[in-house]
Amino acid sequence: QDLPGTDNSTATLCLGHHAVPNGTIVKTITDDQIEVTNATELVQTSSTGKICNNPHRILDGRDCTLIDALLGDPHCDVFQDETWDLFVERSNAFSNCYPYDVPDYASLRSLVASSGTLEFITEGFTWTGVTQNGGSNACKRGPANGFFSRLNWLTKSGSTYPVLNVTMPNNDNFDKLYIWGVHHPSTNQEQTNLYVQASGRVTVSTRRSQQTIIPNIGSRPWVRGQSGRISIYWTIVKPGDVLVINSNGNLIAPRGYFKMRTGKSSIMRSDALIDTCVSECITPNGSIPNDKPFQNVNKITYGACPKYVKQNTLKLAIGMRNVPEKQTRGLFGAIAGFIENGWEGMIDGWYGFRHQNSEGTGQAADLKSTQAAIDQINGKLNRVIEKTNGKFHQIEKEFSEVEGRIQDLEKYVEDTKIDLWSYNADVLVALENQHTIDLTDSEMNKLFEKTRRQLRENAEDMGNGCFKIYHKCDNTCIESIRNGTYDHDVYRDEALNNRFQIKGVELKSGYKDWILWISFAISCFLLCVVLLGFIMWACQRGNIRCNICI
C-alpha cells in the first residue's frame, strides 16, 4: 500500500522505536503495570543447596556444637586450635561429656564465633592441696574416664580441700577469654565426698568485674548416668588486668585462656552440604549468587549478600516502553510512527527510521540515540546492587527463656527492618523504572526534534511520528537525514514548488465538496418555496381548506 502523497517527487520518513510482541510488566511511581521491552529480575529466590568453601573459610562442626568444641568434649578434640570465617553447626550435633549448662550461652557462643578461632594457650595455674584432673564415666576419653580437655576438675586431696586463691595477670596486649565452671552435686553426700565442705563457693574477679557462685545441691534428670550438673561461666581479662580465683570447693578451674580476636567471623546452623565452589553469600539453605540486590531465600546470611525482602519478584526495566506493532499494516500501511506504536524486528538498535521513496522502502537504526540510552541504562543494575549489598552478616539470635521479652523485642525490630527494606526496595525499583521509561521516551523525542530541525519547511509533520518530504529524496538523501548531514537549502526550491502543487490539488478537491453542499442547500430551499406556493394557491381556489381551532 502506497503512502498518501508519495510519488517520484516526494518521500515519506517515519521515526520509530523498538518493540516486542510480548513485553514485561514493571512497576513505576505513576503506574503499577506498564509494559517494557525488557526487564531483569532483582530478587534471588533460590540457593544452590550447598555451602561454598571459597572465598570464606568454612568449618564444618559435624557432630559438635561450638561450645562443646570450646570446652574440649572428647569427641570434639579434632577442633582444637581451629580457625574459621563461618562455623557451621549441624542439627545432629550432640554433647558427649558431663552434662552442663551455660547461663549466658548465647553471648558466649556469639563471642567465640565472632573471634573465629579456638586457639588455646595453657597457663601454669598452681592448685595446692587439691586433687587435679578429675574425670567421669559420663565423659569417656578412650576406655578411661575423662573430662573436658580445657577444664580442670579439682576435688579434695585426702580429707581436705583448702581455700584456693590464685591470681593470673594479663601481661599481653590482647584480651584473654577464661572458661571456668561450678559443679552442682546431686546430693549432700556427693558434695562432702568430693569437696569436704557442706557448701562450696567460687568467686572469680578482675578489676572490672566479679562473679560469686554458690553451688545448688540437688538431684536433676539423669543424663549419661549423671544427675549432677556443671554450670559454665566465662571471664574476659583485658591487657594489664588480673584474674583472681577464690574457692573453697566445687571449682571447675581453667587450664589456660583462649586468645580473642576481632573480625567478621560468625556461626550458622545449617544441614547444607559443604562443597568446593565459590560464593560470597551464604545462607542456611546454601550459597546464593550476589549479582542481584535483593533475596528472598533466608533472613540469616553471611558475607556480601543481597538484602532480604518479602517480595518474591521485583523487575527492573532495562528497555523502553513497549507498544507492540499492529501487524496488519505491512511495512508502512497507513503510516505508523512512534506516536502510534513501536516497530518489531529492529535487531540492530532501539531507535530508527523507515522510509518510502522513488527507490522503494527501507529501514535503518539510529545508533547514536540507541547508544545514548543504553549507556545510561547499563549502569542501573550495578548502582542498585551498590546501594543494597554490603559486607555484613545477619546472625542468628538466641535468648534464654527468662529473656523472652528481649527476644520478642528483637524479633519486632528485625521484622520492622525487613518491612522497611521491602518498602524501600519497592520504591527504589519504581523510581529507577520511571527514570528508564522517561529517559527512553526523551531519546525518541530528541531524535524526532533533531530530524524536524533538519528538514524545516522542506517537509511536513504528519502528527504520527512521520514526515512528508516535499522533494525527491532518494536513498542517499534519506541517509543524509539519518546521519545529520542533510542540507535543506539544496532542496528548498523544489520542496516549495511541490508543496504548492500538492496543496493546490488538495484545495481544488476541497472546493468540489463545498460546491456540492451549497447546491444541495439551494435545491432544498427552492423545493420548500415551490411547495409553499402550491399550498397558498390551492387555499385561494378553495381546493384546500385550513381550519385553525383554539
Curated annotation (Swiss-Prot):
Post-translational modification: Palmitoylated.
InterPro entries: Capsid_hemagglutn (IPR008980), Hemagglutn_HA1_a/b_dom_sf (IPR013828), Hemagglutn_influenz_A (IPR000149), Hemagglutn_influenz_A/B (IPR001364)
GO cellular component, one term: membrane
Glycosylation sites: N8, N22, N38, N165, N285, N483
Record key words, sorted: Clathrin- and caveolin-independent endocytosis of virus by host, Clathrin-mediated endocytosis of virus by host, Disulfide bond, Fusion of virus membrane with host endosomal membrane, Fusion of virus membrane with host membrane, Glycoprotein, Hemagglutinin, Host cell membrane, Host membrane, Host-virus interaction, Lipoprotein, Membrane, Palmitate, Transmembrane, Transmembrane helix, Viral attachment to host cell, Viral envelope protein, Viral penetration into host cytoplasm, Virion, Virus endocytosis by host, Virus entry into host cell
GO biological process assignments: clathrin-dependent endocytosis of virus by host cell; fusion of virus membrane with host endosome membrane; fusion of virus membrane with host plasma membrane; virion attachment to host cell
Stretches assigned to coiled coil: none
UniProt subcellular location: Virion membrane; Host apical cell membrane
Other remarks in the entry: Major glycoprotein, comprises over 80% of the envelope proteins present in virus particle. The extent of infection into host organism is determined by HA. Influenza viruses bud from the apical surface of polarized epithelial cells (e.g. bronchial epithelial cells) into lumen of lungs and are therefore usually pneumotropic. The reason is that HA is cleaved by tryptase clara which is restricted to lungs. However, HAs of H5 and H7 pantropic avian viruses subtypes can be cleaved by furin and subtilisin-type enzymes, allowing the virus to grow in other organs than lungs.
Protein name as it appears in the record: Hemagglutinin
Organism of provenance: Influenza A virus (strain A/Goose/Hong Kong/10/1976 H3)
